[in-house]
Amino acid sequence: MTAIHKKLYFRLRQSLASTLFLKPQPKPMVFIGEGSTVQLSKAIGRFGLRKILVVTDKPLHDLGVLNTTLEALHQAGVQTAIFDGVLPDPTAQIVDDGIVCYHQERCDSVLAFGGGSSIDAAKVIALGAANNCNTAGCLGIGKCKLPAVPFFAVPTTAGTGSEATFIAVISNNETHAKDAVVDPCLIPKAAALDPEIMRGLPKHITAATGMDALTHAIESYIGRWETDDTNYYGLAACRLVFDNLAEACRNGDNLQARESMALASHYGGLAITNALVGYVHAISHNLGAKYGVPHGLGNALLLPHVLELLKEDATEKLADIAVYCGMGARTETSTALTRKLIDQIWALNDEIGIPRTTDVIRTDDIEGLITAALTEGGNYPSPRFITEHECREVLRAISS
């Protein structure tokens, strides 16, 4: 297939996919602020549910972070069962184990409590449980006949925005690929953005997940599927990140900064629900699948490099972001404003301790990574397609 044919093929696929992604989607009821997990628990009780499966990871469970929420659920008349087998980049086997646990415990609903991995796993558990199938039966776009069982979310990191999206990403250990489950019913009925839960988050996780939120905001804004709503959420998320991420990293006890970052993450999730992402995610997903690079860290490493590639094709939109975030005025040229934005991203990365390179990329793997990243990236509404040469240069630039 020639390069021109590939472009036509991917644009056709994007056109077909846009019929789903550009439709208005439901938004979760959101409780925000200290104690919002208790408010969510009370709301779950009002849904008339009997027993909820709490999907989380073992470290959070062992630390007792769930205790307040569990007690609030019990006071609301909701019994709980806990599945704490989620690991970073959850696999189909982990999700299948969660589905088995759901049925064994005779639950009627699911609560995700954790980072993006726990939320993604919980989404597919809720969908698979409703359809009496395993993960394989859920993979793809709208593969299941029945909607997910009632599903709720408490994100414990501020970055993925997964509590606002209808996509779940599942890792395939055999192919080193990321598989997706896409269904509007994966959007939670309600979520809590509680900064108190995020208070103890380590600096390096705060930094990486925060840059994930910024990447969502920027890629959704400069992409070809933007709407008035996604533009609003994207710009708002950008400003929240630039105003609060460094402070959240410096002072994790600053609950106002934590809450602002949680809101930035949520807004980023709302933006990508319709506008999707771009090549930063396409490359980062493959670094995560191949080497286990944390998703937020991969995005942070790649974001300024990919924007350098696309700056001529997205100058006006990048300039919009710079002005909205107070980096310059409209009296300046769009080129100058774009330069300020990219430089500010570099400066923010440095300030919060994001490294400029990684030592995990093996030279022998680069061509395979390029193929996988460009195949994935071709499905996203990026301002333009990037070339193999450009992708190769980006990978070399972040390799130490």
Residue positions per predicted region:
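Short alpha-helical scaffolding segments that buttress acidic/His motifs in well-ordered protein cores
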Residues: 214-218, 261-269, 303, 345, ...
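C-terminal charged capping/lid subdomain of soluble metabolic enzymes
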Residues: 4-5, 9, 318, 325-400
